């Protein structure tokens, strides 16, 4: 995947970004024909298979988006490229540009960066949360619902720790985005202060915090958890010591142990160490014969050492089986 900027050296002043206005980087840009030709050369040499295209804002949002669309259009129309193109939608782009992006791209995205307008104002004062970020995301969501854009959908990104937000705020924004904006994925980026930016003196955000957000996100998207079930502490933070699924299980002893041979697939995926695929395999496996030992858990793809304290195998605690392995 070629990840590239159409232009560097931005007109906006997001406090965390190395490309911010007045930053130390050298401003440069590529014309659509230049970038399209360079990508095709890499494609022909089999060094890349797809394009992830973003840009710093140069000459205004509309002109910047036009250059990006120009690159994508050359690849599709002139060079006949049918592979993966991910287009970042520049905040401030016109609705017709968003429509054009959906006709050209496999996936589109606009970065929320923060969970609310108040948080965004602290870190990206030049961006308008509702008009420039949420509005185009709603436009894409409407197209998805109408069946006009059904490829890889849209994604977004949240910066972690830049605006004093809580983990609950971030996960609340993600849950809302999955529900209302038809998001395919939310990505989380732990703030790592860049020299020469207003946040240069801050401590970097631990990557474990980012990791816990991703784990909680998976619980929302793939494990049937609601936002209210994510185990935040009293301050709205996720534990850095224990993963959220295990912590939820520890906080709900009334739900465990689960009998693997009788539990629904929905209950199995809530067991620490059992994911959607391994839960499905266990359901299929037990149709042929009872699941009686940890070897069967391992065969199904479950992390049996993690799952064992939370399950019964044919009526017996799985912990007793551990001595055999």
Ranges and model annotations:
Residues 132-140, 147, 164-244:
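A structural motif corresponding to the C-terminal lobe/cap of the Radical SAM core domain
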Residues 268, 281-282:
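Short alpha-helical segments in extracytoplasmic peptidoglycan/chitin-binding modules
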Residues 289-294:
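Short, basic-rich loop-to-helix N-cap that marks the start of a DNA-contacting helix
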Residues 285-286:
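Residue-level signature of tetratricopeptide-repeat
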Residues 2-156, 160-165, 195, 200-202:
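Conserved Radical SAM active-site core
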Residues 100-109, 113-114, 176-183, 307-310:
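Structural recognition of alpha->loop->beta junctions
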Residues 198-270, 304-325:
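Long, highly charged, low-complexity intrinsically disordered interaction regions
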């Amino acid at each position: 995947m070629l990840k590239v900027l159409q232009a560097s050296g931005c007109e906006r002043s997001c406090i965390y970004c190395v490309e911010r206005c007045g930053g130390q980087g050298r401003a440069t840009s590529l014309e659509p024909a230049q970038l399209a030709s360079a990508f095709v050369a890499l494609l022909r040499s089999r060094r890349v298979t797809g394009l992830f295209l973003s840009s710093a804002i140069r000459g205004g949002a509309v002109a910047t988006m036009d250059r990006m669309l120009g690159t994508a259009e050359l690849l599709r129309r002139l060079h006949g490229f049918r592979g993966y193109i991910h287009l970042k939608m520049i905040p401030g782009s016109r609705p017709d540009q968003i429509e054009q992006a959906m006709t050209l791209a496999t996936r589109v995205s606009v970065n929320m960066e923060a969970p609310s307008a108040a948080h965004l104002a602290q870190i990206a004062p030049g961006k308008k949360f509702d008009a420039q970020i949420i509005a185009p995301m709603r436009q894409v969501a409407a197209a998805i619902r109408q069946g006009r854009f059904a490829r890889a959908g849209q994604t977004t990104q949240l910066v972690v720790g830049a605006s004093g937000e809580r983990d609950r705020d971030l996960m609340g924004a993600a849950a809302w985005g999955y529900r209302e904006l038809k998001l395919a994925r939310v990505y989380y980026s732990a703030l790592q202060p860049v020299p020469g930016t207003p946040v240069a003196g801050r401590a970097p955000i631990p990557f474990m915090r980012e990791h816990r957000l991703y784990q909680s996100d998976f619980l929302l998207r793939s494990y049937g958890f609601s936002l209210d079930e994510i185990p935040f502490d009293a301050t709205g933070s996720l534990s850095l010591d224990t993963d959220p699924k295990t912590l939820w299980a520890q906080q709900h002893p009334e739900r465990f142990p689960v009998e693997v041979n009788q539990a629904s697939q929905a209950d199995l995926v809530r067991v620490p160490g059992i994911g959607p695929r391994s839960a499905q395999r266990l359901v299929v496996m037990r149709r042929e014969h009872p699941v009686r030992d940890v070897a069967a858990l391992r065969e199904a793809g479950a992390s049996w050492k993690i799952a064992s304290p939370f399950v019964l195998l044919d009526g017996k605690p799985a912990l007793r089986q551990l001595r055999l392995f």
